[in-house]
Amino acid sequence: AHILQKAEELHRLMGESPYEFIRTGETSFAPLWNRPVRGRDTFYRFYTYHDLHLLCCRLKDIYDTYDCMEDAMAAAGPCEDPILRLQQLFADLNGIPVLHGTSACKRLAMFLRWMVRTDGIVDLGIWRTAVHPRQLIIPLDTHVHQISLRLGLTGQKPATLRTAREITDALAKVFPDDPCLGDFAL
């Protein structure tokens, strides 16, 4: 319920078009940092309004150069590692994991899945050219990890990006064009 309240708050701040809100620039971001702060500056969980402001600024920089995120993803040529490309676009922002750490990069993998896959139910499939579904990494959470260990899809005990890649490789043997299709089965 709290995430829905935050989504409604963003809708009130950004209006009908978050894209246009971002494109209009710094002055439109004022509500994100000129708001009265009661206690902490927390927007959601560990993410602050300042973090949200920095994300909007980064998106504006991207949209000043490219028409859309997909174009930014495709700009460097064929995308071998979409998680790395996405991480590079948003490097140094709070909430964006570094790839040499212990993170499984679940949120990045989930975002990419939503943008690339088209299932008509959960995944939006907005991006058609920058990334192919076979390049996606399964969004690894504790449940998928535990089931994958039991099924022998991975032998990795920690839930890291390496583990997510190992599970994805195992699923690619069954679903070579779309390994994340196995996410729903797990």
Feature map (PLM): residue ranges:
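HhH-family (HhH-GPD) DNA N-glycosylase catalytic core used in base-excision repair
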Residues: 1-186
